[in-house]
Amino acid sequence: MSSDLRLTLLELVRRLNGNATIESGRLPGGRRRSPDTTTGTTGVTKTTEGPKECIDPTSRPAPEGPQEEPLHDLRPRPANRKGAAVE
């Protein structure tokens, strides 16, 4: 990526964020847009209910008992296939 294009992308990001610099010029109308801020207040409440440990709802249940894990997820292939690596 050329340095001119990199500078142009950086300038675009700065303008979108409201952080325009002297080198990048001014926004039309001579006004600079302030960065987005959260105007409302945010509160955090402590709850005592629920499990003591973190549980990921997207995770699969733990297996019951020892299970052998495959070394890889690929199908077994014959060793004499065309283009096979020589071991």
From Swiss-Prot:
PTM info: Phosphorylated.
Keyword tRNA-binding: no
Result, substituting residue 42 to I: In strain: Isolate CRNP5, Isolate CRP3B and isolate CRP3A
Keyword field: Host mitochondrion, Host nucleus, Host-virus interaction, Modulation of host cell apoptosis by virus, Phosphoprotein
Residue stretches of biased makeup (Low complexity): 36-48
Region feature Nuclear export signal, mapped onto this chain: 5-16
Example of a GO cellular component annotation carried by this entry: host cell mitochondrion
Location in or out of the cell: Host nucleus; Host mitochondrion
Chain segments carrying region Disordered: 18-87
GO biological process: symbiont-mediated suppression of host apoptosis
Entry's transmembrane regions: none
Domain of life: Viruses
Presence of the UniProt keyword Protein transport in the record: no
Complex formation: Interacts with P and N proteins. These interactions presumably promote nuclear targeting of the X protein in infected cells. Interacts with host MAVS; this interaction inhibits MAVS-induced apoptosis.
Primary role: Plays an essential role in the inhibition of host apoptosis. Mediates host mitochondria-mediated apoptosis through interaction with the mitochondrial antiviral signaling protein/MAVS and thereby promotes viral persistence in host central nervous system. Within the host nucleus, regulates viral RNA synthesis and polymerase complex assembly.
Extra remark: The P/X gene has 2 overlapping open reading frames. One encodes the P protein and the other the X protein. The p24, X and p16 proteins are produced by ribosomal leaky scanning.
Protein's name in the database: X protein
